[in-house]
Amino acid sequence: MSRFFDAFEVYNKNKHAPADFKSHGGSSLNTGATTAYMFAREYRGPSTGEKKEAAAAALAADVKAGKVELVNDPNTADSSRKSSVSEEAMPQMVDISKLTREEFEALYNKINPGMLRKGEPNNKVNF
């Protein structure tokens, strides 16, 4: 009798399977031949140790690339190492509503070089 009600379930992997076949865990759709999808219930965030390792690796890569320099802070008693980001790597907050068109285009081209080629229409609507 319980097999009869299985046909009315919304999601049942074994709905159309033979009686002796049972799938145990996993997803039959993610076989590796196609794109594998991760659903929210399957996601497990990184542990604290993994986060620290990733942050240390990112800092080491930034130091190696020259984006960050490590300096000793004279204000602390133990003079621990702290990172100070160089001036060009720091994001700058700009109020674009107060910029002229030329200043905005110069700033935009500095941030996104090569986005618009010379003579290419920008497809913007002027109000």
Curated annotation (Swiss-Prot):
InterPro entries: Spg4. It comes from the Eukaryota. Residues 71-94 are annotated as: Disordered. It holds the Pfam family SPG4. Belongs to the SPG4 family. Stationary phase-essential protein not required for growth on nonfermentable carbon sources. This is Stationary phase protein 4. The gene is SPG4.
